[in-house]
Regions:
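Short, hydrophobic/aliphatic alpha-helical segments
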Residues: 251-262, 433-438, 480, 643-645
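Short, hydrophobic/amphipathic alpha-helical patches that form generic packing surfaces
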Residues: 74-85, 140, 144, 240, ...
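Short pre-active-site segment immediately N-terminal to the catalytic Zn-binding motif
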Residues: 441-466
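Active-site-proximal, well-structured secondary-structure segments within enzyme catalytic domains
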Residues: 134, 138-139, 177, 183-216, ...
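C-terminal, non-catalytic "cap/extension" segments appended to globular domains
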Residues: 3-31, 37, 41, 212, ...
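N-terminal helix-rich structural modules
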Residues: 2-197
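Charge-rich, well-structured scaffold segments of protease-associated domains
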Residues: 149, 156-170, 354-361, 607-610, ...
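Short His/Asp/Glu-rich catalytic/ion-coordination signatures at enzyme active sites or charged loops
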Residues: 19-34, 83-102, 124-163, 216-251, ...
Length: 681
């Protein structure tokens, strides 16, 4: 799916014809050495483009200089994206290990580029007098990133920064790998402890030869236990197993990483890593993040106290003498309360959400919203589990991208839910490709082709699918830009969760849900009455959800907004939790060791809550009677999604809304359950 442009092709750059690392194998099964060679070709192409950039004579223009820089960036992005994918999904551990090594090597090349004074000088000299706004934005943002990297420091300081970034990358990769491969199991000796779990869950978990049941901390095993299991003991065991799956390995790694990041920030003249990490974001500074946190705290405090009080009152009726509810009881007691207050049992909708129908529903929704078509492709993926789809524009013929769905758990695979670039799109050169790496329940068939397990999903799973697909469409439709450096996800980091959280909101529409939510056995459409109960029950607990986001947001900021020397991670996480959460802390909880967002987002986990405010304001502009076909849908694609990173996030907000985001839509969403009258059973 590559197209040569500007007289520069992959062959000229000296790379193989395989744009995908998993196709660079003579045998059809990628080896560690073949991956290493594939990455080496891409790094060599990157270096060739930089050499050509520095050799340009005369007046520097976007086409003779920025184009070469962008191609160099494109080659690093390509190598980095696919090394990252294989690090997360490769079935062969040797390939995963090699992918991690390659990710480190690619990061080193990126750091060297960011500290290259000659390149900075060349980019600074580009004549932008006739350049487009997007080109100006690209150059200005790139030059800022160079200054924030320390390109203006002396040779010794830049060498030290290079070493520190190399160390930080290695620590981050190892932290993530420990989470990925850190799954634990718990053994259930008594079947009575499984009471409350769905029938299809029990059917998948038959006793072993000793008569015991073995459960894992993978999402399809863990989430139902935390939501439905009546046994306090089982929930607490699962909670602790899940929150210690990368402990103690990641404890010291995190401490070392915090110290390394702080040293980088200090060398660059910042008081903390948080101030460095927010300097080129929409938020701008750690102080602005704290102001936002304070506003969220005030907005959610009363609602969260009310929600907890109502659930606790109900729980005490079920368990007389109960004083407090602990962290392992949160999902369970919310589920029980919703059954009582709203006559809604979340198990009741699971039969309407078999995986295959949900997938089709998400595809159909996105196709209508964005005016595209999806066509299953025979192109190879990185594993036999992967489904591949081509994206066609509104005419049904023009190919605009491709995506890969790797949606179910397997050994060695990353345990979370994420969207990832695969090929960075550049207009006229590469069509964009992206992938989803998820862990939804796997449908099963017997040898006769009869479905034995439909892979029933909880409604929160369906919301997650919509969320990740929002990222995917951002990568594809935003990947038609002139420059790789502005393609797809290349917005400010604290704008990136807007498209994902926007698409979540479409799950609340009755007509949209009924278009795909059908009972896996009878074909019955999900009743409107049940949808209404689901929506009302789902609205209850939003303030509590915001408090959870506040906890993660404040923790990520606090860890990076001070000198980490002497930080006691156990004390910090517990103390902060108890200041924000009414649910009793469980001793032995080491959640920080598996808080993977500390790697990619570092101090900036606030992105989720900040972008929720923007996304809800965006969604409020859509016509509820015609969500997928209203004028706002077309405007959203044009003004936001298709832009990729071609405009600053602040400008995209103003282009779509005609103003800055406001808090009112978020406040309405937050208080929706309490604002509605006569909604309880």
């Amino acid at each position: 799916m590559s197209v040569a442009t500007s007289g520069i092709s992959d062959s000229v750059l000296g790379v193989s014809t395989a744009i995908h690392a998993w196709e660079a194998s003579a045998s059809g099964s990628l080896t560690a050495d073949e991956l290493k060679n594939w990455v080496s070709e891409r790094i060599a192409a990157h270096e060739s483009a930089i050499a050509a950039l520095l050799a340009v004579e005369g007046v520097r223009t976007p086409e003779n200089s920025l184009r070469l820089y962008d191609i160099a960036l494109e080659q690093l992005n390509l190598a980095g994206a696919q090394a990252g994918v294989l690090n997360s999904v490769a079935a062969d551990k040797e390939v995963r290990d090699q992918a991690q090594d390659e990710a480190q090597r690619i990061a080193q090349a990126g750091t060297a580029l960011s500290l290259n004074r000659e390149v900075y000088g060349a980019l600074s000299a580009i004549d932008l007098s006739a350049a487009s706004d997007a080109t100006r934005h690209f150059v200005e943002r790139t030059l800022l990133s160079y200054r924030l990297a320390g390109v203006d420091k002396d040779d010794a300081t830049r060498a030290h920064l290079n070493q520190l970034h190399e160390k930080a990358t290695l620590l981050s990769l190892q932290f993530s790998r420990n989470i990925q491969e850190g799954a634990k199991t718990i053994v259930v000796h008594n079947a009575d402890q499984l009471d409350g779990l769905p029938a299809d869950y029990l059917a998948r978990h038959t006793p072993n030869c000793d008569g015991h049941f073995v459960l894992s901390t993978d999402q399809p095993d863990m989430q139902p236990v935390m939501t439905f299991a009546k046994s306090d003991d089982l929930r607490e065991r699962m909670f602790l197993a899940y929150n210690t799956r990368a402990y103690p390995a990641n404890q010291q790694i995190l401490m070392d990483l915090l110290a390394t990041r702080q040293e980088i920030a200090t060398l660059l003249g910042f008081s903390s890593w948080a101030n460095l990490a927010t300097a080129d974001q929409m938020m701008g500074s750690a102080a602005n993040v704290r102001s936002f946190i304070a506003r969220l705290e005030e907005a959610s405090r009363t609602g969260a106290e009310r929600e907890y009080g109502m659930v606790l009152e109900y729980a005490r009726k079920q368990q007389p003498g109960l004083k407090v509810m602990n962290a392992a009881s949160r999902g369970y007691w919310y589920e029980q309360y919703r059954r009582e207050a709203f006559a809604f049992d979340s198990q009741s909708v699971r039969p309407y959400f078999p995986y295959a129908q949900v997938e089709q529903g998400v595809l159909d929704t996105a196709a209508k919203l964005f005016g595209v078509h999806f066509k299953r492709s025979s192109a190879p993926g990185w594993h036999e589990d992967v489904s591949v789809f081509d994206v066609l524009d509104i005419d049904g013929e023009t190919l605009v991208g491709r995506f890969y769905l790797d949606m179910h758990p397997r050994d060695g695979k990353d345990k979370w839910f994420s969207a990832t670039p695969v090929v960075t799109g550049v207009r006229g050169r590469y069509l964009p490709e992206a992938g989803l790496i998820c862990n939804f329940p796997r449908p099963e068939m017997n040898e006769a082709g009869v479905v034995t397990d439909a892979g029933l999903m909880q409604y929160n799973d369906v919301v997650t699918y919509f969320h990740e697909f929002g990222h995917l469409m951002h990568a594809i439709l935003g990947g038609q830009t002139e420059w790789a450096g502005l393609s797809g996800f290349a917005t400010e980091g604290d704008f990136i969760e807007v498209p994902s959280q926007m698409l979540e909101e479409f799950f609340r529409d009755v007509a949209l849900l009924q278009s795909f939510a059908r009972h896996f056995e009878t074909g019955e459409v999900l009743p409107a009455e049940l949808i209404q109960k689901m929506k009302l029950a789902g609205a209850f607990g939003r303030a509590d959800w915001v408090r959870s986001q506040l906890y993660y947001t404040t923790l990520s900021l606090d860890l990076h907004d001070q000198d980490p020397t002497g930080i006691d991670l156990d004390k910090v996480t517990k103390s902060l939790y108890e200041s924000l959460q009414p649910w009793q802390w469980i001793e032995g909880n080491r959640m920080y060791a598996s808080f993977g967002h500390l790697m990619g987002y570092s101090s900036n986990y606030y992105t989720y809550a900040f972008d929720k405010v923007i996304a809800l304001d965006f969604f409020a502009q859509f016509d509820p009677a015609n969500l997928l076909g209203c004028a706002a849908a077309t405007k959203y694609r044009k003004a936001v999604i298709e832009q990729g990173g071609s405009r600053p996030g602040r400008q995209m907000v103003r282009d779509f809304l005609g103003r800055d985001e406001e808090f009112s839509a978020f406040s309405d969403w937050l208080n929706e359950e309490f604002a509605a009258a006569g909604t309880r059973a």
